[in-house]
């Protein structure tokens, strides 16, 4: 009998379901540990709540960073288009949801190592990584860091689609 395998699968499922950073309609506040930046992004959408739950994974990419949160980078129902400054990587997100507007406003946590610059020749934007109301899964390619996000909102679907920018960092 394969009962240990069944227990592991059930445990894995329970662990994953509890891994969301935010609740439906709740605040989101996530920062990678010092010296890490965002490596993976996952999200699911609920038509009932007209909101997304989010999860992030991090990877060691920085040595001695200085970090800051931006001001809000989008208005309700408007385009979000943001890139960190040269040499910076995205290491966190902060947002809150408004039930009347069924949207989120976002702040982004950028971190920079001294003497690091963005190698703009290596930068690339993804296409949209999720469909309206669909799951979102994105992994930053090996040896790259997450540097930018684009998101558009649709008032009929009350959801956002997302694109991400990744770049390599180089010594300045």
From Swiss-Prot:
<feature type="repeat" description="1-1">
    <location>
        <begin position="21"/>
        <end position="25"/>
    </location>
</feature>
<feature type="disulfide bond">
    <location>
        <begin position="32"/>
        <end position="58"/>
    </location>
</feature>
<feature type="disulfide bond">
    <location>
        <begin position="111"/>
        <end position="117"/>
    </location>
</feature>
<dbReference type="Pfam" id="PF14704">
    <property type="entry name" value="DERM"/>
</dbReference>
<comment type="similarity">
    <text>Belongs to the dermatopontin family.</text>
</comment>
<keyword id="KW-0964">Secreted</keyword>
<feature type="repeat" description="2-2">
    <location>
        <begin position="102"/>
        <end position="106"/>
    </location>
</feature>
<feature type="signal peptide">
    <location>
        <begin position="1"/>
        <end position="19"/>
    </location>
</feature>
<comment type="function">
    <text>Possesses the property of inducing both aggregation of amebocytes and agglutination of erythrocytes.</text>
</comment>
<feature type="repeat" description="2-1">
    <location>
        <begin position="50"/>
        <end position="54"/>
    </location>
</feature>
<dbReference type="GO" id="GO:0005615">
    <property type="term" value="C:extracellular space"/>
</dbReference>
<feature type="repeat" description="1-2">
    <location>
        <begin position="73"/>
        <end position="77"/>
    </location>
</feature>
<feature type="repeat" description="1-3">
    <location>
        <begin position="129"/>
        <end position="133"/>
    </location>
</feature>
<feature type="disulfide bond">
    <location>
        <begin position="67"/>
        <end position="172"/>
    </location>
</feature>
<dbReference type="GO" id="GO:0030199">
    <property type="term" value="P:collagen fibril organization"/>
</dbReference>
<feature type="repeat" description="2-3">
    <location>
        <begin position="158"/>
        <end position="162"/>
    </location>
</feature>
<dbReference type="InterPro" id="IPR026645">
    <property type="entry name" value="Dermatopontin"/>
</dbReference>
<dbReference type="GO" id="GO:0031012">
    <property type="term" value="C:extracellular matrix"/>
</dbReference>
<feature type="disulfide bond">
    <location>
        <begin position="84"/>
        <end position="110"/>
    </location>
</feature>
<keyword id="KW-1015">Disulfide bond</keyword>
<keyword id="KW-0732">Signal</keyword>
<protein>
    <recommendedName>
        <fullName>Hemagglutinin/amebocyte aggregation factor</fullName>
    </recommendedName>
</protein>
<feature type="disulfide bond">
    <location>
        <begin position="123"/>
        <end position="167"/>
    </location>
</feature>
<keyword id="KW-0677">Repeat</keyword>
